[in-house]
């Protein structure tokens, strides 16, 4: 049986998949319903169609009205968006873009650093890249009634709230609010879609804005680079061979880099489990204390782990304290936190649990337990 793949289906599904991986919704059906409803609203507001089409026979007549229905005017809409070509961070090789630096006082930098520290989008950035973000952001003061962004407009900036209260409107209906924290405006910059909502100030406030070019150059490009590095790392981990590419990509997004110097203790025997570690670069030394030793603090080296190997999963699987200490021999490790470990590694659990038996055999061989 032959099936015709309609034009636009691949792009549509790819965009939806990216949105799912980014948002990680708990209810996929509800998210899909909201996503495609919003997409339909944007298409109507643009007076066009974004969807899938089958190639009709030459003699077929179309019964689709070419004129879009007239829509009620939106009191928030100032101008309709004509979206630019989608930004592909993987294809961006421009290294000549001038970096923007807006002067800031020490007090302003401290406030901005506090405002951005918990923003998920910035999690993949290292310290130097975060300083680039802070340098490139500029202050924008608002008063009650100011519209920061309007539904249907082009995306120009990404905003982080320093202080103030802001209402969120979709199709003239208030759907939420921000108070003294939060961020908004990234979706229009990431996907080249019109603004999906209107944000209006209800009090005096201060925002920090990052322009479209800087947002893409610093945030999206570096996030894509980091994801690519992590995906290549995870491909070398044997237990992840069975994962689908999208599962590995989801896992890569959950990794956070931590850097350790030679001799640093990464995890200590007896501590609670905080995550599962994957070695991005360098080496790690595994050491254990024996209850039978005359010196209870004496440790015995049991293994050396290299790039692509992992450790720390046994304490997560057994809910027991760390069974060994791990020390950095060289530099960098990746951490997958406990919540992400449990959420994302279901397909790998059986493989990991088999390591428990191996670990018990190794402990018995080394210490006679």
Curated annotation (Swiss-Prot):
One of its GO terms (molecular function) is cAMP-dependent protein kinase inhibitor activity. Keywords: cAMP, cAMP-binding, Nucleotide-binding, Phosphoprotein, Repeat. Residues 56-79 are annotated as: Disordered. It holds the Pfam family RIIa. Belongs to the cAMP-dependent kinase regulatory chain family. One of its GO terms (biological process) is adenylate cyclase-activating G protein-coupled receptor signaling pathway. It comes from Strongylocentrotus purpuratus (Purple sea urchin). Tetramer, composed of 2 regulatory (R) and 2 catalytic (C) subunits. In the presence of cAMP it dissociates into 2 active monomeric C subunits and an R dimer. The modification Phosphoserine is found at residue 81. This is cAMP-dependent protein kinase type II regulatory subunit. GO terms for cellular component: cAMP-dependent protein kinase complex; cytosol.
């Amino acid at each position: 049986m032959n099936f015709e793949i309609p034009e636009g289906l691949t792009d549509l599904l790819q965009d939806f998949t990216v949105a799912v991986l980014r948002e990680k919704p708990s209810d996929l059906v509800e998210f899909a319903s909201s996503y495609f409803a919003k997409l339909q609203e944007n298409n109507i507001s643009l007076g066009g169609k974004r969807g899938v089409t089958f190639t009709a026979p030459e003699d077929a007549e179309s019964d689709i009205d070419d004129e879009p229905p007239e829509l009620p005017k939106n009191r928030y809409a100032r101008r309709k968006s004509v979206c630019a070509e989608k930004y592909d961070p993987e294809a961006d090789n421009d290294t000549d873009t001038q970096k923007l630096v807006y002067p800031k006082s020490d007090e302003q930098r401290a406030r901005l650093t506090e405002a951005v520290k918990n923003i998920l989008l910035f999690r993949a950035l290292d310290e130097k890249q975060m300083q680039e973000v802070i340098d490139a952001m500029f202050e924008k003061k608002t008063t009650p009634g100011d519209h920061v962004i309007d539904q249907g407009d082009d995306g120009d900036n990404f905003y982080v709230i320093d202080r103030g209260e802001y209402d969120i409107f979709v199709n003239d209906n208030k759907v939420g609010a921000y108070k003294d924290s939060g961020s908004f405006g990234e979706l229009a910059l990431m996907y080249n879609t019109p603004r999906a909502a209107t944000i209006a100030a209800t009090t005096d406030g201060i925002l920090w804005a990052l322009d479209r070019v800087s947002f893409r150059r610093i945030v999206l490009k570096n996030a894509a680079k980091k994801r690519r590095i992590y995906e290549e790392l995870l491909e070398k981990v044997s237990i992840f061979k069975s994962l689908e590419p999208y599962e590995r990509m989801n896992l890569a997004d959950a990794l956070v880099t931590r850097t350790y110097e030679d001799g640093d203790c990464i995890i200590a025997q007896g501590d609670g489990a905080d995550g599962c570690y994957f070695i991005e670069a360098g080496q790690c030394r595994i050491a254990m204390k024996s209850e039978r030793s005359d010196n209870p603090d004496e440790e015995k080296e049991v293994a050396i782990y290299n790039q692509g190997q992992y450790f720390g999963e046994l304490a997560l699987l057994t809910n027991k304290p760390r069974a060994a200490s791990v020390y950095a021999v060289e530099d960098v490790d990746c951490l997958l936190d406990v919540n992400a470990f449990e959420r994302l590694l279901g397909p790998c659990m059986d493989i990991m649990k088999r390591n428990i038996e191996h670990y018990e055999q190794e402990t018995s061989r080394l210490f006679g337990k």
